[in-house]
From Swiss-Prot:
Function in brief: The light-harvesting complex (LHC) functions as a light receptor, it captures and delivers excitation energy to photosystems with which it is closely associated. In chromophytic algae, LHC is associated with photosystem II, energy being transferred from fucoxanthin and chlorophyll C to chlorophyll A and the photosynthetic reaction centers where it is used to synthesize ATP and reducing power.
Gene3D superfamilies for the chain: Chlorophyll a/b binding protein domain
Native source species: Phaeodactylum tricornutum (Diatom)
Designated name of the protein: Fucoxanthin-chlorophyll a-c binding protein F, chloroplastic
GO molecular function: chlorophyll binding
UniProt record similarity statement: Belongs to the fucoxanthin chlorophyll protein family.
Pfam families the record matches: Chloroa_b-bind
Transit peptide boundaries: 1-31
Bilayer-spanning residue ranges: 73-94, 114-134, 174-196
Its membrane topology: Multi-pass membrane protein
Amino acid sequence: MKFAVFASLLASAAAFAPAQQSARTSVATNMAFESELGAQPPLGFFDPLGLVADGDQEKFDRLRYVELKHGRISMLAVVGYLVQENGIRLPGDIDYSGTSFASIPNGFAALSTISTAGIAQIVAFIGFLEIAVMKDITGGEFPGDFRNDYIDFGWDSFDEETQFKKRAIELNQGRAAQMGILALMVHEKLGVSLIPN
C-alpha cells in the first residue's frame, strides 16, 4: 500500500516537471530507419523505448540480428510445442537410467522431469552456440545472414525485391512466433489449452 501511494506521488510530481526537448531527435531517428526492413504498416518504424534514438546504424543492426535470432528460435519452439502436444516423440531414452522420451510430459512439466545434468548440458550447448557458432556475423549481406559456401538454398537466384520481401516475411513470422510461444506458455500456466482436442 505504501508503495502504491509513493508511486502515485512520483507520478503526480513528474506531471509538473519540465519536458525533455527530444522531439527533433526522435523525428530524425524515425526518418533514418523508416526505410529499413521491418518498418511496415500500420506502425512503420516502432521504437517506443528509444533504443536507437541516437541513430546508430551498428546498434540498429545488432538489435535486428537479435530480433531475427529470437524469431527463428520462437518459430522452432512453436513447432516443437505443437509436435509434442500431438504426441509425436523421439524414440529411445533420454538418459541411461531408462527414462524414455515418451514418458516426459509437455511444456514446463518437462523441466522437473529432466535431470539437472541434462539441463546443464542443454544450457552449455546453447552457450556454445552463442559464443562459437551463432556469433554476430558482420560479414554477411544483412544481419542474420548465416549463408556460407555449403548452405545457400538458391538465395542468390532471387532478385533484390524478392529477397527483401522474403526477409520481411521471415521477420514478421518471427514476431508472430514470439507472441505465439508466449501465449502457449501463459495458457499452459493458466491451465487452459489453446490446442483443440
